[in-house]
Amino acid sequence: MTSQPLRVGIGGPVGSGKTALTLALCRELRERYNLAVVTNDIYTQEDAEFLVRNEALAPERIIGVETGGCPHTAIREDASINLEAVDQLNRRFPGLELILVESGGDNLSATFSPELSDLTLYVIDVSAGDKIPRKGGPGICKSDLLVINKIDLAPLVGASLDVMDRDARRMRGDKPFVFSNQKTGQGLDEIIAFIERQGLLTAA
């Protein structure tokens, strides 16, 4: 176990499935690791309340941050409010191994400050159309893992997963991506394996 927890940033546009992924990760990882969560919303603590309501973790392990402005700023240019939440969790739970930091919904230009996140997951969803991967932006091109979510909606919105696969490979080079459906859990094992492998986590 390292002296500092692994911090995993989870970003992506509004409605892409960040909170659903955070919930799924908590449910799968809470028995393996000493785990906590920070969520970001502009004017509310809605995502934190959702996680508490769904018993993702004990309530005291979840901190909801109200950014009061552009969610991008709170995870990149001035991450102090999030860094304070991380410090608070570290003080509250000595020996923390993993902190998930979920950003507020933002556009394709959002990225995490390296001061705040050791690994970044960027979540997009199929319902926005199969053109999204080729639009690029730091989240799509530079995140450690791109999660293409809600693949069950592809036939309903006329999106081609083959096109998204091709464009994701072209935009990301050697960086990995995964197709997922949080309703069924598809892709979750791959996401967890990535976090454990890249974050050098060893389950108790």
UniProtKB/Swiss-Prot annotation:
Any single GO BP term: urea catabolic process
Keyword Oxidoreductase: no
Gene3D superfamilies linked: P-loop containing nucleotide triphosphate hydrolases (3.40.50.300)
Location relative to the cell: Cytoplasm
Coiled-coil features, chain-numbered ranges: none
One GO cellular component term noted in the UniProt record for this chain: cytoplasm
Superkingdom of origin organism: Bacteria
Pfam families reported in the protein's UniProt record: cobW (PF02492)
Known role: Facilitates the functional incorporation of the urease nickel metallocenter. This process requires GTP hydrolysis, probably effectuated by UreG.
Family: Belongs to the SIMIBI class G3E GTPase family. UreG subfamily.
Protein name per its UniProtKB record: Urease accessory protein UreG
